């Protein structure tokens, strides 16, 4: 389902239930990437929009997939990658399985999964 949200043009928001921190609950996010983190755990990298958070307000967050359940692809879409997005995973993600591509100048966003 998350791959479907990322592959859509435009991409869709998702909502899921997360139990990987001290504030379990539903999160709504803009999914950007699925990859392995430094501990080789499969993670969703997403722009956090709403829900409980132990790591502050809106911004990029990583969610370990073993703690993600009840995923729903929402009808609401988003324009594409947020500022600061690193399609190569940056220093904390590797073995990318699915991700948004940064659009080329004067072209629409491309998606790759």
What is each stretch, according to the model?
Residues 1-113:
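Core beta-strand-centered patch of the WYL/Sm-like small regulatory domain
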